[in-house]
Design a protein with these regions (language model features):
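S-adenosylmethionine-dependent methyltransferases
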Residues: 1-230
Length: 230
């Protein structure tokens, strides 16, 4: 276990979260008050890209996804990329399951939290602060994973384009979502572009009054997948 555990250098007054899932006990830090993270964004910075700090919370979809990852029988040496890694929870789970994992987020604050949280759980982080509209990573992966990233319509095309460019020919993408407004349009567009969709897990979370789906996307034979999507 890495001894860097006090996290005094992290911004936004971090608090500790502890999870027990599938026989694993994990710890993570997150901002104590997400509203403070939101308030830290200046009007000028917001107007540049209308970025909101969704990364600052551990969402129910990610919790369901965490359990799924921890029990999945992965092959050895699989290479994974998590888009929108946020707090690094899913990346940590993949690393615990011996997957070679890259973690990517547009927020440098999220990347700091992800980096430290991965180390806290005894893993070696590979974190890149980048935008999925232009990743700048010349590498392809066996699996691309993400949770709670289709929260705006403008992300549908860039996310699909990013997955297409970063997946190996026989690679797959796993995305978890609480069936928000743009989830069905995302799935429809993915089908139009030739992705094959399969539901890995679907669950109603009564106490949260939401439905969570973990979706797998793989390539079909549609030639559209070799084209630029936006």
């Amino acid at each position: 276990m890495n001894k860097i555990a006090d996290f005094n250098d992290l911004p936004f007054s971090p608090k500790k979260l502890a999870f027990s899932s599938e026989g694993y006990s994990l710890q993570f830090f997150c901002p104590e008050n997400p509203d403070i993270v939101l308030d830290s964004i200046s009007d000028s910075d917001y107007n540049k890209d209308q970025f909101l700090p969704y990364w600052a919370q551990h969402w129910p979809s990610a919790q369901q996804f965490l359990s799924y990852i921890l029990q999945y029988p992965f092959k050895t040496d699989i290479e994974v990329c998590e888009l929108g890694c946020g707090l690094g929870v899913l990346s940590t789970a993949f690393m615990i399951r011996k997957c070679k994992t890259f973690s990517i987020d547009i927020s440098h604050h999220a990347c700091r939290y992800s980096h430290q949280n991965i180390m806290l759980n005894g893993c070696i982080p590979k974190v890149l602060c980048s935008d999925w509209r232009n990743i700048g990573l010349n590498k392809r992966f066996d699996l691309i994973a993400a949770s709670d990233i289709i929260y705006e319509s403008r992300w549908v095309e860039p996310v699909l384009s990013c997955m297409n460019s970063m997946l190996l020919p026989d690679g797959k993408a796993w995305i978890a979502d609480p069936c928000r407004r743009y989830w069905d349009p995302f799935k429809m567009r993915a089908k139009e572009l030739g992705f094959i969709l399969r539901t890995l897990k679907y669950e109603k979370v009564t106490e949260k009054k939401m439905e969570i789906e973990i979706l797998e996307l793989s390539r079909g034979k549609n030639r559209l997948l070799n084209q630029v999507l936006y």
